Every structure is written in structure tokens, then in C-alpha cells.
């Protein structure tokens, strides 16, 4: 049986409550607390190329910026960001080097499934772990979910 992993999205989803304004020092404290709490996957915020970066907010336009809140001792945890399909160009991502995030959660709506999955493939080719986030899941029929699962399993 596979092991269940716990993902914490405080620094991203919690940003809907405070406009992602956590403060740089608090971002680092939260991440360290999550590592110490033995959370498996820590989502550090939003990745979106078009935003203006401010270190007090968990919205990033480069993966290097995300690396500033990731502790040197990662404690075996995975660090990720969420990126909406169409708001970043996976071709522009640096190749994975272990200095920043380990993976990217690619979010897309049903109408963007093909493009979203192509983006997932490109992210994976850069060496990152890929997490597929189908948005508004209630809009999918059972058959469409099965199609999505099948197509995700084809990503190499």
C-alpha cells in the first residue's frame, strides 16, 4: 500500500484571507514550523510570471525567489508552488537543481485540460515533480475524470 502524504497550503490558500501578505520573516517561520511538524509537502505560494515581486508576499515571479523561504535543512520535505495554466511559461523554467522548489502544482480548468497537461509534461521535462490540480472538479463528469486520470498517467 502506498503512503498517504499531507500537503499544507497555508502560504498559498491562506493568502486569500490576507492578500498573501504574511511578511518575509513570518513566511520563513511558517515554513520551518511546517517542516518541524512533519508535513510532507509544503506549498510556498503562487508562481505567476506577471506579478511584481515583494518579499513580504507569497506571490513569486521566479523560482529563485521561492528558494529564499526554504530552509537549508529541508528535513526530507517537498516544497512546491501552485501555478495556474496560462500564467507561466514552463519553457522558461530553469532546470531543476534542488536550490528552490521540488515541484509545481499546475492548476487548470476543464476547458484547458489539453494545454494544462502539456504544461505538466514540460514542467516534468525540466526535472520538477508535477502535481495536477483540476480546478472546479464538480464540473467534471465521471467519464471526464477517468479521461483526465488516463492522460495524466501518460505523462512521461
Question: Which positions does each model-derived feature cover?
Answer:
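N-terminal small/glycine-rich loop or linker at the start of catalytic domains
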Residues: 1-19, 76, 99, 129-133
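N-terminal glycine-rich anion-binding loops that anchor highly charged ligand groups
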Residues: 2-9, 31-48
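Short, acidic/polar
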Residues: 23-33, 86-96, 142-151
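Active-site cofactor/substrate anionic-group-binding motifs, chiefly glycine-
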Residues: 62-89, 103
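Glycine-rich, proline-tolerant flexible connector loops at the mouths of alpha/beta enzymes
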Residues: 40-68, 105-113, 136
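Conserved, mostly hydrophobic/aromatic
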Residues: 14, 34, 104
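Helix-rich catalytic cores of soluble enzyme domains
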Residues: 97, 103-156
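Active-site beta-loop-alpha junctions enriched in small/polar residues
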Residues: 9-12, 16, 47-49, 82-86, ...
Amino acid at each position: 500500500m502506498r503512503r498517504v502524504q499531507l500537503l499544507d497550503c497555508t502560504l498559498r490558500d491562506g493568502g486569500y484571507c490576507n492578500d498573501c501578505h504574511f511578511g518575509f520573516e513570518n513566511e520563513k517561520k511558517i515554513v520551518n514550523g511546517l517542516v518541524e511538524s512533519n508535513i510532507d509537502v509544503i506549498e510556498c505560494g503562487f508562481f505567476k510570471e506577471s506579478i511584481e515581486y515583494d518579499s513580504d508576499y507569497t506571490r513569486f515571479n521566479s523560482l529563485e525567489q521561492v528558494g529564499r523561504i526554504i530552509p537549508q535543512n529541508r528535513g526530507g520535505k517537498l516544497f512546491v508552488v501552485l501555478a495556474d495554466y496560462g500564467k507561466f511559461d514552463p519553457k522558461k523554467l530553469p532546470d531543476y537543481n534542488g536550490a528552490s522548489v521540488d515541484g509545481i502544482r499546475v492548476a487548470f480548468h476543464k476547458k484547458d485540460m489539453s494545454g494544462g497537461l502539456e504544461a505538466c509534461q514540460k514542467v516534468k521535462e525540466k526535472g520538477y515533480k508535477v502535481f495536477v490540480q483540476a480546478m472546479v472538479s464538480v464540473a467534471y463528469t465521471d467519464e471526464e475524470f477517468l479521461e483526465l486520470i488516463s492522460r495524466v498517467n501518460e505523462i512521461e
